[in-house]
């Protein structure tokens, strides 16, 4: 599969941001909002954002594929967070200082425990070999998704370790105007990050599946390139998001030549998300799920088995797919 950057750290905004003392439209009970100014950030300029590949920011939960127990595994995002005492000290420090980087963390004592199999995200900053928390006091990381995991049941529904495959949504290889849902070898996704989207993820902004027949799949980061973007100016991007069909997305992620990822979210521009009608739901989708090459039968309740029963079917949009079969 074509590979762009992977999400292994918090992505900065393409613009310099400012905090406004107004209720957040993104997070309930948050008494402030983070808005973009008209100034491009130094990080974006240093990464040569003008020559970056612009892609759709897909709204789900971040995942990672890397080896575990001698085979490719799906990993779920799990950030190490400070315990109550350390969090209290950190917030008190932030009220008196501007730079979170000046806070002294004791990584042995200040953080809540995580499973032994937890690993830190690859690109986070380290000091003396130990991961350094980000500006929110979190250490981004990953835990493997075990088969039949209750905590990560929606993650485990989109992979089969027995057959080494994942349920993936991407453009149809022969027609970029059509989406395709297919079984992709996990080995092809090694060291990539992906977004898990679906019925029970992040409020289901794409209207996928139903409570009775939940539907989830993985989308590789960078899978949906954005064409014909306007110039990198605040008002031009605002008009693009508001005024064209392609702009009905959560945001944009720029994949820069040095591997850096830069983003802008609709909320940075004071715009609403989710939307009643998204660009992702404007494209037809084909199911490509012929499982005949696998010797053993799939569990009849698995998504792979259910999709195999509608193999080769074409739907007008993602939200039209039903697994009531």
Swiss-Prot record:
Source species, domain of life: Eukaryota
Post-translational modification: AMPylates itself (auto-AMPylation).
Cofactors: Mg(2+); Mn(2+)
Stretches assigned to coiled coil: none
InterPro entries in UniProt: RLIG1 (IPR041211)
UniProt cross-references to Pfam families, sorted A to Z: RLIG1
Its EC number(s): 6.5.1.3
Keywords assigned: ATP-binding, Ligase, Nucleotide-binding, RNA repair
GO-annotated molecular function: ATP binding; RNA ligase (ATP) activity
An individual GO BP term: hematopoietic progenitor cell differentiation
Function of the molecule: Functions as an RNA ligase, in vitro. The ligation reaction entails three nucleotidyl transfer steps. In the first step, the RNA ligase reacts with ATP in the absence of nucleic acid to form a covalent ligase-AMP intermediate and release pyrophosphate. In step 2, the ligase-AMP binds to the nucleic acid and transfers the adenylate to the 5'-PO4 terminus to form an adenylylated intermediate. In step 3, the RNA ligase directs the attack of the 3'-OH on the 5'-phosphoanhydride linkage, resulting in a repaired 3'-5' phosphodiester and release of AMP.
Protein name, UniProt field: RNA ligase 1
Species of origin: Rattus norvegicus
Species lineage: Eukaryota, Metazoa, Chordata, Craniata, Vertebrata
